[in-house]
Design a protein with these regions (language model features):
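Conserved helicase NTPase motor core
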Residues: 1-37, 52-56, 254
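Short glycine-/polar-rich loops that comprise or flank the Walker A/P-loop
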Residues: 10-13, 19-21, 42-46, 84-89, ...
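A short beta-strand-to-loop transition that corresponds to the Sensor-1 phosphate-sensing loop
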Residues: 18-21, 28-32, 52-54, 64-65, ...
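Short alpha-helix plus adjacent loop in nuclease-associated cores
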Residues: 21-26, 55-56, 148-171, 183
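Switch/connector loops and helix/strand junctions flanking conserved nucleotide-binding motifs
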Residues: 23-26, 56-62, 69-70, 76-77, ...
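Flexible beta-alpha connector loops of hexameric P-loop NTPases
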Residues: 24-28, 48, 92-93, 344-352
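Helicase P-loop NTPase motor core
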Residues: 43-46, 51-145, 168-173, 242
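Conserved helicase C-terminal RecA-like lobe
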Residues: 132-144, 157, 164-352
Length: 352
């Protein structure tokens, strides 16, 4: 801001385009005061308010005006359009996220069956990626094709795959793929060479990888990997003794004792916070199931629909990703305190 003031001090030749009602790049250092207080710095400014909207219906604009009018210190501005009034906004008060997802899928199916819209006409917005889990499950169960824009499908996310691999490694000792996935997650000093030695031992002795892992001292493992393998085998042994605790508790225990959650907490980044939210969502989704087998069977059923050329798909994305896009039918989920807006923004009016 100071650089602009110095450059324009003599000729006052500054042209600025902005929106005084939003500051979506505050996390990158943008300051909304540069817009709100611009006329103080340049009293001779000519202001042109662009308040005609060419995309939305008046119903949507009225709702937006109603919300945005509560902004502190804003410049008065009412959006309008010459388009038709449009459909009314529908508010559905759901009991929880399961009820919410069921209602959305029901509405989408109803409108699609009536021939009034294609799958690609529908978009579902959420604040955090973790919220997509229940939506993906319900869409897959209803055989509705979908895509996740600007992100990865819930069960394809790295941390979710890691957590499920721990669970599968405990429940199924012969699941070599899952064991190898988490053998060095978090890092235990077990590299590819150590895994190769275990593979060679298993092949030479005609045993499974899990059995080779249990006999790692005989496989010629050396260096830091010795401690890492000892800790891992001890962890899997402890978790196996608690397999009857149920999937939710076993997941929580595995992630805590392995140090996985601690590593994410110590990272203190937005990405790590998102991964923690995804893991919390996964653990919560496992609570209704009594056994790990039942839960893992349900997870295996939530698989992506077959890809087809030019296939029409329902779109799932965060609100941030959705900026500038248009859809005939939009659902916004999780409109509740602590989620929308985030609980981290509630104490700061500027964040709201």
């Amino acid at each position: 801001n100071e650089i602009v003031l110095k450059l324009a001090d003599e000729h006052r030749n500054v042209f600025v385009v902005g929106d005084s009602d939003q500051s979506v790049y505050a996390f990158r250092g943008a300051d909304i005061r540069n817009i709100l207080e611009f006329e103080k710095a340049f009293p001779d400014t000519s202001v042109v308010i662009l308040n005609q909207n060419y995309r939305s219906t008046q119903v949507i604009l009225d709702a937006a005006n109603s919300v945005i009018s509560n902004n502190f210190g804003r410049k008065p501005k009412d959006l309008w359009t010459d388009k038709t009034t449009g459909e009314k906004i529908v508010l559905y008060r759901a009991d929880d996220e399961v009820d919410e997802a069921a209602w959305i899928i029901g509405e989408v199916q109803r409108l699609h069956q009536h021939g009034t819209l294609r799958w690609s006409d529908v978009a579902i917005f959420y604040r955090a990626n973790a919220q997509s889990r229940i939506l993906e499950e319900r869409l897959a169960s209803a055989s509705i094709p979908y895509r996740v824009v600007g992100g990865t499908r819930f069960y394809d996310r790295r941390e979710v795959k890691d957590a499920l691999a721990y669970l599968r490694a405990v429940v199924n000792p012969s699941d070599e793929v899952s064991i190898k996935r988490v053998l060095n997650v978090p890092k235990r000093g077990v590299g590819d060479s150590s895994v190769a030695r275990l593979d060679q031992y298993a092949l030479a002795h005609g045993v499974s990888f899990r059995e080779a892992l249990a006999n790692w001292p005989e496989a010629g493992i050396s260096g830091p990997a010795k401690k890492g393998l000892a800790n891992f085998t001890e962890l899997i042994g402890q978790l196996s003794q608690r397999a009857s605790d149920g999937p939710a508790e076993l997941l929580q225990t595995a992630l805590e004792r392995s140090g996985y959650l601690e590593e994410l907490r110590d990272e203190r980044s937005i990405e790590a916070e998102g991964r923690l939210e995804n893991l919390a969502e996964l653990i919560g989704s496992a609570e209704p199931f009594e056994t790990c087998d039942e839960f893992l069977e349900q997870v295996s059923l939530v698989s992506p629909t077959d890809d087809l050329d030019d296939q029409s798909e329902v779109t799932l994305m965060t609100l941030h990703t959705a900026k500038g896009l248009e859809f005939p039918l939009v659902f916004i989920v999780g409109m509740e305190d602590g989620i929308f807006p985030s609980f981290m923004s509630l104490g700061d009016p500027d964040q709201l």
